[in-house]
Amino acid sequence: MEKTIVIYKSKYGSSAQYAAWIAEELGCRAVSIEEFKKNDLKNYDNVIYGGGVQAGGIKELDKFMKWIKSDLKLLDMYRSGKITAEDLEKSGVSDRHYAIFAVGINLDDMEARQQLRDINFPKSYMKQLPCFFLPGEYHPENLKGADKMIMNLAQKMIKGKRESEITDNDKVMISYMENGCKLIDRQRIRPIIEEMTR
């Protein structure tokens, strides 16, 4: 697919793997956000950003959102009738299409998805962004420093609930946190491919 780029932030590998699969399917490049330059965005009509979820935030999404903020505001103004299609065309934004993917081990839980959207897309102009939730993998033995501390705290919070408050999802999460998990699945990128090729 011409003029498409997949930008990602990956710490343990799942986001990079999904980015590579998406790029392969779309016939484009995948590049880490550290290697990508903001000024190069103008060369692409379709931009996909993805990153792992940590403490409710999508890694480096704030940096990416700063890059595309003016585009999103213009698209929002167009959708709300504040500017015309001609105005949008003049801005060079009219054909640009963005999508976001988040990778984590608790993203099949609808409440977790909503929290993620609330935390990462607080402004009205951000809410238009399609966001896809992809299952990652987790290996507790690989964690160090702050990552280990965050996961230990999350585990303590769940285990600290009263027995009657612990949900089935909490039990699954405790198992993942204690034993690790490998949930990564290439088939889960299909909705992203469909979104970017429609």
Per-region residue spans from a language model:
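Short, Lys/Arg-enriched, disordered terminal segments
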Residues: M1-K3, T197-R198
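N-terminal beta1-alpha1 ligand-phosphate binding loop
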Residues: K3-E25
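Hydrophobic anchor at the start of a short beta-strand
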Residues: T4, C28-V31, Y98, L129
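Short loop/helix-cap segments at secondary-structure boundaries that form the rim of catalytic
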Residues: A23, K38-N43, M126
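A short, well-structured beta->alpha microelement
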Residues: G27-N39
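Structural motif
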Residues: D45-I48, H97
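Short glycine-/small-residue-rich Rossmann-like dinucleotide-binding loops
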Residues: G52-V53
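FMN-binding flavodoxin-like domain, especially the glycine-rich phosphate-binding loop
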Residues: G56-R198
